[in-house]
Amino acid sequence: MSWFVDLAGKAEDFLNKVDQGAATALTKPNQKSSLSYNSPDATDSTQYNAAAYSSTQQHRDSISASSLGTSTFISAAAGNIKKSKATVLAGTANVSSTTPLGSSSKASSNFVRPRKSEVNDDLLFDFLNSSDPPQSEKKEVRRETVSKAFSPTGVSAQSQMPTVSLASDLHTGPSVTPTPSSTQGLSRNSSLGSLSSSSHSVKTEDSSTRDQSQADVPESLTAGLDDLADPQPVLEIQSQDLQQQQQQQGQEHVISNLRLENQLLRNEVSSLNQEMASLIQRAKDMQEEVNLGRARADKWNSDQSRVDRTVRELSSQVDDLTEALSAKDGQLAVLKVRLDEADQLLKARSSALEEAQNERVRILQDHSEGSSLHSQAVQTLQDRLRDAEAAVKREQESYRQIQSEFAARLAKVEAERQTLAESLTNAERRLTEEKQRAEDLQQQAKSSRSAAEYTKQELQDYKNKASRILQSKEKLINSLKEGSGLEVLEGAGAGVELEELRHEKELQREEIQKLQAQIQSLRTEIQDLETQALTENESWREQLAEVQEQHAQQIRAKQEIEAELERSKQELQYIEEEHHRTKITLQGRVKDREDEIQKLRNQLTNKALSNSSQAELEGRLHQLTETLIQKQTMLEALGTEKNSLVFQLERLEQQLKSLQGGQNSASHINMAAMEGPGARQRNTPILFSDGDGPGTGVYGKVRKAASTIDRFSIRLGIFLRRYPMARVFVIIYMALLHLWVMIVLLTYTPEMHHSHPDGR
């Protein structure tokens, strides 16, 4: 709905201009209409005064008709009220009314004034809404001032007729203009939709009335000038006095009727306010008309653009003609000025020639000094290059020495690994022997268990047999005791046998106890053998795991050393290539500088000191300044290259030192594994040992992450060193990023949402 808001804003601006025109008409009554005839260039004042003069001609007839009767004027006032109502409903400020005598009157409000302050609008609203009597006094004062402006002599009756009609026009003008101001005030508070269609009708009627007023201006102006210029005879003074009295009476009737009309207009304004409330409800229906009006507005805009184009073309033609005339007039003065300037230019050229010669001598001296400084700088750079080459050679020798040390350490590590492998094989052999012994002990334990079970079974059988014998003996004894016919000898023999049996029983019990003690001792021995075998197995397993772990650590350390050696070889190769490239580029640049210096020396020696024209001197001076600037830039570039080479050498020294330190730290070997094969080691946890792999412990993980970051940074530095365009691109990107951030921070203003005082 932005287009709808734009249309409403345009309509509101148009109504504001109409209200400001009415306010200027009320606040400035002393403005004379004769100024419109003296200023033909001001189109707005011409249209306004022409419309006012035509309205005076129209109101002259209305005043003559109002002198006939009051009823006729009241009917005219009613007609004006109806037509002002029609203009409010249509949203226009131009009124075309018809008097009872049939004279067609044109709109007199066809003017647009510049925008005034809000104080004038408030005064206008207070003036229109107030019902105080000073309004008529202001109107009478305005009528007297306008009559004085139109009739300075005060003797012609025809000059007074436009005065009365103009005063009446000024009285009736505000009665027409308050209606759009009231509608404007209501439209600000109620709806913007009803003003969209009214803006189009206002523009069309404004353009039509403007064309009509512009077409009628010459006739009305010629008629008014003829009326003002005609001399009146002295004999018609009495008739003019009578006409003046009649006109005064008619003016009094007009004033009273205008007051009545003002009251009626106020009532009509209140009714129009109610109608505006109903128009708000009809805003939805007006949307379709707005769509149709959009097409008409586009057509009108195209027509207006064509008219503006033609006006601009005509104005441009007029401007071209005026400029051509002014150019023709100014050519003579320009020629005179050019003659003076030519004389001054000759003097200035002669002085400039002397200054150029002095400057040439000074530049030659500066150039000789600059060439000497340049040769010194080139010599120092060559010395630094030789020093850098010597340093590179020293670094290469140190690298070869480090490589030989690495080879010796690697051989030592291989020998240690071989000894560890032999110790591992011995430990495995001992482990197999111990396993065999454990199996033998287990077999012995099984055999002893089976023997114990067999002895237990024999003991149980013997117990059963002895119990059976004892039971039979007891039965025999009991049977003998019961027998009374036994002899004493048999009784004595039975007692002896009984004693023997008891003695055997005791012996058997002792044997059983001995066998039980032997079984218990065998059980304890078997348990001791089992526990000893388990402990020995566990210890051998631990020793085997330790040996395997040490072997894996040695393999990992060897792999790390080999990778570090390969990386150092690659870095050394990169450094050698970089030094070779820098050496070649520096040699090429030194040759180029020497060639340029030789060319400049040849030019200076071969240059003939002959009299030459000023153009040649200026060209040579310009060439010398350019060469001097180039030499200065070359010196600055060489200085920056020198600093970069120094920085690169320092970085290479630091890298070599760090590489040596890393290799020394990586060459440490855990010598705890070199002890005797039978030695028992304690499993103490080691967190920061040098022999740990990169994947074991917190220290290994941290060292692995640091090594990856270091490798990435080294490769990035080598890439940036190898490609200068990448360095330039990174620097430009960072500079542009900071510049953009500064621009955004300095130019950013947060949005502030606030209500517009006019309702827009």
UniProtKB/Swiss-Prot annotation:
GO biological process, any: Golgi vesicle transport
GO cellular component annotations of the record: Golgi apparatus; Golgi cisterna; Golgi membrane
Instruction: For the region Disordered, give the residue spans.
Output: 95-114, 126-216, 432-456
Q: Which residues form the signal peptide?
A: none
* Membrane-crossing residue ranges in chain numbering: 728-748
Q: Name one GO molecular function term.
A: protein homodimerization activity
Give the protein's function.
Answer: Involved in maintaining Golgi structure. Stimulates the formation of Golgi stacks and ribbons. Involved in intra-Golgi retrograde transport.
Q: Report what the protein is called.
A: Golgin subfamily A member 5
Species of provenance: Danio rerio
